[in-house]
Curated annotation (Swiss-Prot):
Protein residues bound to substrate: 72-74, 85, 89-91
Superkingdom in the source lineage: Bacteria
Reported cofactor(s): Mg(2+)
Protein name: Deoxyuridine 5'-triphosphate nucleotidohydrolase
Any one GO MF annotation of this record: magnesium ion binding
Catalytic activity: dUTP + H2O = dUMP + diphosphate + H(+)
GO BP term (any one): dUTP catabolic process
Alphabetized UniProt keyword annotations: Hydrolase, Magnesium, Metal-binding, Nucleotide metabolism
UniProt pathway annotation: Pyrimidine metabolism; dUMP biosynthesis; dUMP from dCTP (dUTP route): step 2/2
Enzyme nomenclature, EC number: 3.6.1.23
Enzyme class per UniProt: hydrolase
Gene that encodes it: dut
Amino acid sequence: MTVAISAAVQQLPHGQGLALPAYQSAHAAGLDLLAAVAPDAPLVLAPGTYALVPTGLTLALPPGYEAQVRPRSGLAARHGVTVLNAPGTIDADYRGEIGVLLINHGSQPFTVRRGERIAQMVVARVARVDLTVAASLETTERGSGGFGSTGR
């Protein structure tokens, strides 16, 4: 079941004229984020480099929610370009500009142009945990195995 919530968004001056983030299909989980680079100054990511790409947006999520900034699969598959800190987290109390940290893992330079869809933003509920110190933890079949311990 899909839950609908409302969130206020503000376009910063360098984001004016760009479309707001939008879902691209009826059941899409993420809204596409657009690059708010200057029209006459595209951003070129050389292979192996990264940059913080502006979106020209600020967002006010309701308490109990976060937004996750995730890669677009097409950029990764076709160009080797992805979100470096995926998923990036936008907390409900953050009011700064949404930025997308893109990295080029490909072998060719990648040009980010104004209005290009560069990432997707998924809004999700957040559970907050109250940590308590324990002398021991309940044992499990897996135990402390990690980093590939469950097989290929």
